[in-house]
Amino acid sequence: MVTKAKTARTPTVGFVSLGCPKATVDSERILTQLRAEGYGIVGSYDDADVVVVNTCGFIDAAVQESLEAIGEAIAENGKVIVTGCLGAKGELIREVHPKVLAVSGPHALDEVMEAVHGALPKPHDPFADLIPPGGIKLTPRHYAYLKISEGCNHRCSFCIIPSMRGDLVSRPIGEVMHEAEALVSAGVQELLVVSQDTSAYGVDVKYRPGFWGGRPVKTRMTELARALGSLGAWVRLHYVYPYPSVDDVIPLMADGVILPYLDIPFQHASPRILKLMKRPGAVEKTLDRIHAWRAAVPELTLRSTFIVGFPGETDPEFEELLDFLKHAQLDRVGCFKYSPIEGAVANELPDPVPEELKDERLERFMETQAEISAARLDAKIGRTIEVLVDEEDEVGTLARSHADAPEIDGVVYLEGVFGLKPGTRLTVKVDEADAHDLWATPV
């Protein structure tokens, strides 16, 4: 139990962060503000005067995980503030957990702080030097997510993000660059650019110029990527919608300004299914563009995600998807079974695919891609590549190459290599590979 003396000395907040990297950035902003106001951040329910839970509500499994996390926090602590995507469904949260102190939606910093102030009065004398230059981060010190916008203008039939996070709102480019500079100054070696639709950055403000370094810079993905690349850190683009404008960043990759890595969620390859999803459907043009990108940047890594078992997906259409994988030769791929999400338009589509068939298709999809990924990694044996050290374990050092985003891609194992600090960059020679990872030796 928290004593009055402890509360008077340093009010403490526990934090649970769930969901995607965009939610992680929201959590980091809340944590930074809490520290700026003098609150202590603790890692256990017992030590916390109040607990903030930043939720995810994108799919049913995420909703359930969030509700369970809220329930655990209530059981272990009792004073719980809920925010995040599931917070947009406040009635559901209060129905399941009526004891929560407050509920707010995503990117609701002011509302969260108001709720914290109501439950736990603001400390009298916070110190500015409690805040690291790059703010409070939930990631290791050597990499950080950089969120450049909120919301999305697309209305994909399987997605409810716009109803939770609203339409696209781009952050001012000067603000983004100042944050990036602070992160790099604090030791960050890799900036992972995230948003719901990175390639649409600036569309909402008609690409109007902002200011950074005393000069005007357009609020647009290409100009942002070029400016970020000038800071000296790795720059990795995530969640890039397959617009023609993607072609404009390929020269920056060829010139080494940003990493030769694109995370583009293609979702499917059947034109009919893509139309039902309300996604771009020119598959042949997509393959042509992939080949053109690789011709310009041979070391380009392509990551994508797909959905199998979408309502109405036939056997021939699933075979189209497998054929696309074989022609596209993507490096990293994630795949999900279609799951009905409350509020999604796709729920109303006819001919749902049976769960057993979804499972079978998912297995075949992953088997097909595993062979492709293994072959592409096997082709790297004997090459020298640059890696970034993440951590050390009892076997050696774990690092990542340009082709590996943290947590979702593979790693490069440096067995028997010790003493390298996280964030160190070095050149290694690839000795072995499997379908996911590489083994290498420092050069």
From Swiss-Prot:
Entry-linked NCBIfam families: 30S ribosomal protein S12 methylthiotransferase RimO (TIGR01125), MiaB/RimO family radical SAM methylthiotransferase (TIGR00089)
Protein name: Ribosomal protein uS12 methylthiotransferase RimO
Regions annotated as coiled coil: none
Superkingdom of source: Bacteria
One CC-aspect GO term: cytosol
Binding site residues for [4Fe-4S] cluster 1: C20, C56, C85
Phylogenetic placement of the source organism: Bacteria, Pseudomonadati, Pseudomonadota, Betaproteobacteria, Nitrosomonadales
CDD domains in alphabetical order: Radical_SAM
Gene behind this protein: rimO
Cofactor(s) of this protein: [4Fe-4S] cluster
Cell compartment(s), UniProt: Cytoplasm
Main location: cytoplasm
Species this chain originates from: Thiobacillus denitrificans (strain ATCC 25259 / T1)
